[in-house]
A protein has these predicted regions:
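PRPP-associated nucleotide enzymes
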Residues: 1-146
C-alpha cells in the first residue's frame, strides 16, 4: 500500500472542513476527544477552532497495545446521574456533546471498540437510550476514511 503524506495546510483544511460540517448541523460539542496518537493533533486543532476543551483517549488496537477506558466520558455522553434520588439514573438534559476525532478510519474497529467500552461502562442495559446517544450526543470524525 502506498503511503500518502499530508502537509500541515492539508490537515488544517481537513479540520476546518469538520468544523464547517458540524456548524452546518448546528451542533457544537462541549469538548473534543482525540484518539491517541494520530487523533490528538487534529482534535487539538478542532478544539481551538471551536474554543472548547480537548481530552485524549488511548485506543491502540493495531499494535496489541492496551486501551484505556474512561468511564467518566461515557457518563458525560449518557447523562449519568449518581444520585439515589434519581430513579432513572440518567437525564438526557445532562448529556454532554462529545466529538471524537481520529486521524484515519480504516475498518471502524477503533470506534466500535469505543462504543462497546462506553456502553458496557455506563448502564449497559439501557441500549435504546444509548442508541440515541450515538450520532446525536456523540459524533465521530476522522481526517481520512479508507
Amino acid at each position: 500500500m502506498n503511503k500518502i503524506y499530508y502537509s500541515w495546510q492539508d490537515i488544517e483544511h481537513q479540520c476546518q472542513s469538520i468544523v464547517n460540517s458540524i456548524a452546518r448541523e448546528q451542533w457544537r460539542p462541549d469538548y473534543v476527544v482525540g484518539i491517541t496518537r494520530g487523533g490528538n493533533i487534529p482534535a487539538t486543532i478542532i478544539s481551538h477552532m471551536l474554543n472548547v476543551r480537548c481530552e485524549a483517549l488511548k485506543i491502540a488496537l493495531r499494535d496489541n497495545a492496551e486501551c484505556e477506558s474512561n468511564c467518566w466520558m461515557a457518563e458525560d455522553a449518557f447523562g449519568y446521574v449518581d444520585d439515589p434520588e434519581y430513579q432513572a439514573r440518567w437525564d438526557p438534559d445532562l448529556r454532554k456533546k462529545i466529538l471524537v476525532v481520529d486521524d484515519i478510519n480504516d475498518t471502524g474497529e477503533t470506534l466500535n471498540w469505543l462504543i462497546r467500552d462506553w456502553q458496557s461502562a455506563c448502564l449497559p442495559q439501557e441500549e435504546y437510550a444509548w442508541n440515541t446517544v450515538w450520532g446525536n450526543t456523540v459524533k465521530f470524525a476522522s481526517l481520512v476514511d479508507n
